[in-house]
UniProtKB/Swiss-Prot annotation:
Record: residues binding NADP(+): 11-39
EC number: 1.1.1.184
Protein name: Carbonyl reductase [NADPH] 2
Organism of provenance: Mus musculus (Mouse)
Keywords, comma-separated and alphabetical: Mitochondrion, NAD, NADP, Oxidoreductase, Phosphoprotein
Pfam families, A to Z: adh_short
Expressed in which tissues: Predominantly expressed in lung, in ciliated cells, non-ciliated bronchiolar cells and type-II alveolar pneumocytes. Also detected in adipose tissue (at protein level). Low expression in testis, heart, kidney, spleen, brain and liver.
Catalytic site: Y149 (proton acceptor)
Amino acid sequence: MKLNFSGLRALVTGAGKGIGRDTVKALHASGAKVVAVTRTNSDLVSLAKECPGIEPVCVDLGDWDATEKALGGIGPVDLLVNNAALVIMQPFLEVTKEAFDRSFSVNLRSVFQVSQMVARDMINRGVPGSIVNVSSMVAHVTFPNLITYSSTKGAMTMLTKAMAMELGPHKIRVNSVNPTVVLTDMGKKVSADPEFARKLKERHPLRKFAEVEDVVNSILFLLSDRSASTSGGGILVDAGYLAS
């Protein structure tokens, strides 16, 4: 997808690997100035070599105070991609307080915090903007051992709608992308059992999982003016799974 983001500044969380990393690369190639946020410094070092000129920020978004310190003075942002997330696989009866708190602090609370910072600045500057929350199809369907992750993504669905309603009058659009399994490092955890992965893939009408590029293209579309009247919804990148 050929889009031009020249003159715009984007912030991408979870930028070190997978979907976030490729989103940074695509935005950089499309002319945007990009702030890349992740907690692993080595990922930022290698990403900066691939994308000269990006602004790397190393912070654990699960730490509220550290995030405030790292991003509180980040400056104007026109495009935000909330991609940071983690998966802790446990059945319901074995979910620990630590796993629950960690999952919600990274997968959901950080979306609140970073979005508040960015949206307040957009409003103060009187400029439109676009926010994309990277969710999952498990916001809508259940999978074994993903109850905590699914709960964070289900909550993100309502957060996206509420943000769109409240920020819409300020010309700030908010949407989500909801992919099926994407074979990133995180996605491979879900599909580690070959037999489970085979059966799961067969339940997708297109008989495939999503490629990282598929998700990135949907993110870019929602960030761009080509989706100027789209807000409060989500794009399913699920190879038809929910339709089945």
